[in-house]
A protein has these predicted regions:
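Conserved small-residue-rich
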Residues: 71-131
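Short, charged recognition helix plus adjacent turn
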Residues: 38, 52-74, 78-84, 134-151
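DNA-contacting interfaces and partner/effector-binding or oligomerization modules
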Residues: 1-20
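Short alpha-helical DNA-recognition segment
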Residues: 17-38, 87-106
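Residues that mark the N-terminal boundary/hinge immediately upstream of a DNA-recognition element
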Residues: 10, 19-21, 32, 46-49, ...
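Short, basic-rich loop-to-helix N-cap that marks the start of a DNA-contacting helix
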Residues: 30-54, 111-124
Length: 151
């Protein structure tokens, strides 16, 4: 239990550092976040647990970690949902992020997790911040129950 508390303290310190308003992540911090994210995967946390940690007052997880732990189909649904709501065509979104949809899906699938610096370009193209994006993921996830599966 001691090591788990250390882990949560690291999460808490990280979220305090970013103040839940992250515009960009420097490499050093991203490496730290990725390491914490891998520890989370090892402990077998679920999507619901990550959303809970995002809200909980005592233990918090960074927005980047939450994003990194969501299954790709949920992320893609949220991207499409925001794109349609803002009347952004697939073509203009692809141009903004300098890669086509098939390529960025393949990129995420082959890497197994989100490359945050690449994903920032998608958020910019959608003109939405990461917290709002995660809220959309939560809405979609809650609307569909647990039907969304990875892969």
């Amino acid at each position: 239990m001691e090591s788990k508390n250390n882990y949560y303290n690291k999460l808490l310190n990280t979220i305090d550092y970013y103040g839940l308003k992250v515009n960009h992540v420097k490499n050093k911090e991203f490496i730290m976040l990725s390491t914490l994210e891998r520890e989370c995967h090892r402990s077998g946390s679920t999507i619901d647990k990550f959303f809970y940690l995002m809200e909980d007052k005592e233990y918090k997880i960074t927005p980047e970690e939450a994003l990194d732990n969501l299954p790709l189909p949920l992320i893609m649904k949220a991207v499409d949902s925001i794109r349609k709501e803002k009347n952004i065509s697939k073509r203009s979104l692809s141009k903004s992020i300098e890669m086509d949809r098939a390529n960025y899906q393949k990129y995420y699938k082959s890497k197994g997790s989100i490359n945050f610096s690449s994903f920032t370009r998608i958020l910019e193209a959608l003109d939405v911040d990461l917290i709002s994006f995660l809220e959309r993921c939560r809405e979609i996830n809650n609307g569909n129950g647990m039907e969304i599966k990875e892969g």
